[in-house]
């Protein structure tokens, strides 16, 4: 009886995986020609769910797609995908696909409810030297290792906006986990973004890559999310445009994480908060990106310095974990538990 139950659960999981990666080529059976399908793929829309996640207006902006064609594509996609409503029980079953990637520290994992979650954006912010980039490098290795709940490990895409990625650091962390250096480095796809526009364009490539190797990639890292936006849009006059572009990019990230069941981890910087002096805070600083980034991130983690190599992580915002703190250490082998 139990074996039957396990088989049913596994087949249910596979059904969910298949519905997640329904290829856009299926539209051919519903009268959409291959030329139009290629146009959709060129902008990173590679799955039926991807069409559902894109507005008609955005589809009309794709070169060569008229309003009539877009309407036809939407109708065809709706025939292939299930209706929008599920019971809470059905949704909880679907949530079983969610996996967690360990941070390298048991205390930190406990704080996050198991680690960095898939189908979600996890943001870590803090001043310089609080461990943001070290955490990014550690996740590049731990995401490749088998974990709890049947997680088998996978590949990573790392988008670097500040030229802080160091392959040698991955070798040191790989030594700690007894993993082959070459294998670890081969499983990390690296891209350097130079402008906020370039950063957005790279996400089209990311979506195409996730689709091409469906289920192989497990983690997308952007270190750091706001650095290029700060440079490209300066002063209050450009703030509205910056926030609009940022909102579009974050919406794209959210959709990618859900469409391909990957974890998205982003780091963020801090800025002085002049208004907070009235609240008598000792060190008034806040993460940049404003309300748009605050609402887009599923889980927000605040990092601050402790004694020596110790760092303190605090849940700043989370839909399921309580506001709490954990102490971790930055070691030669990446993020680890603090020694008592």
Curated annotation (Swiss-Prot):
Gene Ontology annotations for the cellular component aspect, listed alphabetically: chromosome; chromosome, telomeric region; condensed nuclear chromosome; lateral element; nucleoplasm; nucleus; site of double-strand break
GO molecular function terms noted in the UniProt entry: ATP binding; ATP hydrolysis activity; ATP-dependent DNA damage sensor activity; DNA strand exchange activity; double-stranded DNA binding; identical protein binding; single-stranded DNA binding
A UniProt-annotated Pfam family: HHH_5
PROSITE patterns in alphabetical order: RECA_2, RECA_3
Source domain of life: Eukaryota
Tissue distribution: Testis.
Coiled coil: none
Entry binding sites for ssDNA: 230, 233, 236, 242, 311
Database matches in SUPFAM superfamilies: P-loop containing nucleoside triphosphate hydrolases, Rad51 N-terminal domain-like
Keyword set, alphabetical order: ATP-binding, Cell cycle, Chromosome, DNA-binding, Meiosis, Nucleotide-binding, Nucleus
Binding site for ATP: 126-133
Record GO biological process: double-strand break repair involved in meiotic recombination; double-strand break repair via homologous recombination; gamete generation; homologous chromosome pairing at meiosis; male meiosis I; oocyte maturation; oogenesis; ovarian follicle development
Functional description taken from the UniProt entry: Participates in meiotic recombination, specifically in homologous strand assimilation, which is required for the resolution of meiotic double-strand breaks.
Assembly and binders: Double stacked ring-shaped homooctamer. Interacts with BRCA2. Interacts with the MND1-PSMC3IP heterodimer. Interacts with RAD51AP1; the interaction is direct and stimulates DMC1-mediated homologous recombination.
Entry's family note: Belongs to the RecA family. DMC1 subfamily.
Protein name, as recorded: Meiotic recombination protein DMC1/LIM15 homolog
Lineage of the organism: Eukaryota, Metazoa, Chordata, Craniata, Vertebrata
Gene: Dmc1
């Amino acid at each position: 009886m139990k074996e039957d139950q396990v088989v049913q659960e596994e087949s249910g999981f596979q059904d969910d995986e298949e519905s997640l990666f329904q290829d856009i080529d299926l539209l051919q059976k519903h009268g959409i020609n291959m030329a139009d399908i290629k146009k959709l793929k060129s902008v990173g829309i590679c799955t039926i769910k991807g069409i559902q996640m894109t507005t008609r207006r955005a589809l009309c902006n794709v070169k060569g797609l008229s309003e009539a064609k877009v309407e036809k594509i939407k109708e065809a996609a709706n025939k292939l995908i299930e209706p929008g409503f599920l019971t809470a029980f059905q949704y909880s079953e679907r949530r079983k696909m969610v996996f967690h990637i360990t941070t390298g520290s048991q205390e930190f994992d406990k704080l996050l409810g198991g680690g960095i979650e898939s189908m979600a954006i996890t943001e870590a912010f803090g001043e310089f030297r609080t461990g943001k980039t070290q955490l990014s490098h550690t996740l590049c290795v731990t995401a490749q290792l088998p974990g709890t709940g049947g997680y088998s490990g996978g590949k990573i895409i790392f988008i670097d906006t500040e030229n802080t990625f160091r392959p040698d650091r991955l070798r040191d962390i790989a030594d700690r986990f007894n993993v082959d250096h070459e294998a670890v480095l081969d499983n990390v796809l690296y891209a350097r973004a130079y402008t906020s526009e370039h950063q957005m364009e790279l996400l089209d490539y990311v979506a195409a890559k996730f689709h091409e190797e469906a289920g192989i990639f497990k983690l997308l890292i952007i270190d750091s999310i706001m650095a290029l936006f700060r440079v490209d849009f300066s002063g209050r006059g450009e703030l509205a445009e910056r926030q609009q572009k940022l909102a579009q990019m974050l919406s794209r990230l959210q959709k990618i994480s859900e469409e391909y069941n990957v974890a998205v981890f982003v780091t963020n910087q801090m800025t002085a908060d002049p208004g907070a002096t009235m609240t008598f805070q000792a060190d008034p600083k806040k993460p940049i990106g404003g309300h748009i980034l605050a609402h887009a991130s599923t889980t927000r983690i605040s990092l601050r310095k402790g004694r020596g190599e110790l760092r303190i992580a605090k849940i700043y915002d989370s839909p399921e974990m309580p506001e709490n703190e954990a102490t971790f250490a930055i070691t030669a082998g990446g993020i680890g538990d603090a020694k008592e």
